[in-house]
UniProtKB/Swiss-Prot annotation:
Native organism: Renibacterium salmoninarum (strain ATCC 33209 / DSM 20767 / JCM 11484 / NBRC 15589 / NCIMB 2235)
Family matches, as NCBIfam families: PRK00595.1 (NF001860), rpmG_bact (TIGR01023)
InterPro entries for this protein: Ribosomal_bL33 (IPR001705), Ribosomal_bL33_CS (IPR018264), Ribosomal_bL33_sf (IPR038584), Ribosomal_zn-bd (IPR011332)
GO biological process: translation
Similarity-based family: Belongs to the bacterial ribosomal protein bL33 family.
Top-level division of the source organism's lineage: Bacteria
Name this polypeptide is given: Large ribosomal subunit protein bL33
Amino acid sequence: MAKDKDVRPIIKLKSTAGTGHTYVTRKNRRNDPDRLVLKKYDPRIRQHVEFREER
């Protein structure tokens, strides 16, 4: 069905604040080969914090 090395895999973004909150998104491996880091809202602490790609 799906290719093992998909160009746009589904990834989890985990909060660096240690709350355990995650977002699920897709990323393009050709444009972003490194681990993705985005600043997003963490509702558990009501602040914007960095979310890092989890493997």
